[in-house]
Structure formats: structure tokens, C-alpha cells
UniProtKB/Swiss-Prot annotation:
Organism placement in taxonomy: Bacteria, Bacillati, Mycoplasmatota, Mycoplasmoidales, Mycoplasmoidaceae
BP-aspect Gene Ontology terms: translation
InterPro entries documented for this protein: Ribosomal_uS10, Ribosomal_uS10_dom, Ribosomal_uS10_dom_sf
Official protein name in the record: Small ribosomal subunit protein uS10
Gene Ontology CC annotations of this record: ribonucleoprotein complex; ribosome
Species of origin: Ureaplasma parvum serovar 3 (strain ATCC 700970)
UniProt keyword annotation of Translocase present: no
Length: 101
């Protein structure tokens, strides 16, 4: 029976995301699970345009940008030790982790 655990990580801050990915890779290597990734997924870029003035001057606008960085890690036939270590993993605020079997 071939099982694979897909771990998808999302964050607005790529440094936090990369640190979390390194932690998961270290856990996988120390417990002996086979790992594919981290695979960088496309970055979602959202741009918001807001008027600077509350009344007139529609030509004066300000733009803000929000980027969502994503990574995918695939563990093939994860060991029970790996699953326990991932359950205990403390993820920093700002990083969203999704597990799929």
C-alpha cells in the first residue's frame, strides 16, 4: 500500500515559510521518511488600488500589493515517528499548513 502525505504551506512572508519548510525536511530526514520537495508553487499576487483623497483628486491613487507564497512537500510512506513529530510541530503565526493523505 503506497501512501503519500501532502503538506501544503502558505504564507505572506517567504522567510517564515522557508524556515518552516526546513524544519519539516529535518524532521523527515531524522525519522527516515522519503521526501519529495519542497516544490515552490506559483505566488499569488493581489493588487489593491485606493484613492488617496477622501473627496476629489481621483487621479491620485495608491496601490498596495499582497503576495501569497506557497510550497508543497510530499512524504512517501510516512513513518509513524514522522507523523507524531509533525503533530507536535509548532508552526509560527503567519504560516498556514494543510495536510492531505
Amino acid at each position: 500500500m503506497n501512501q503519500e502525505l501532502r503538506i501544503r504551506l502558505e504564507s505572506y512572508d517567504h522567510r517564515l515559510l522557508d524556515d518552516t519548510v526546513k524544519t519539516i525536511v529535518n524532521i523527515s530526514n531524522s525519522t527516515g521518511s522519503k521526501l519529495r520537495g519542497p516544490i515552490p508553487l506559483p505566488t499569488k499576487k493581489e493588487i489593491f488600488t485606493i484613492l488617496r483623497s477622501p473627496h476629489v483628486n481621483k487621479s491620485s491613487r495608491e496601490q498596495f500589493e499582497r503576495r501569497t507564497h506557497k510550497r508543497l512537500i510530499i512524504l512517501e510512506n510516512p513513518q509513524p515517528k514522522t507523523m507524531e513529530a509533525l503533530k507536535r510541530l509548532s508552526v509560527p503565526f503567519g504560516v498556514e499548513v494543510t495536510f492531505k493523505i
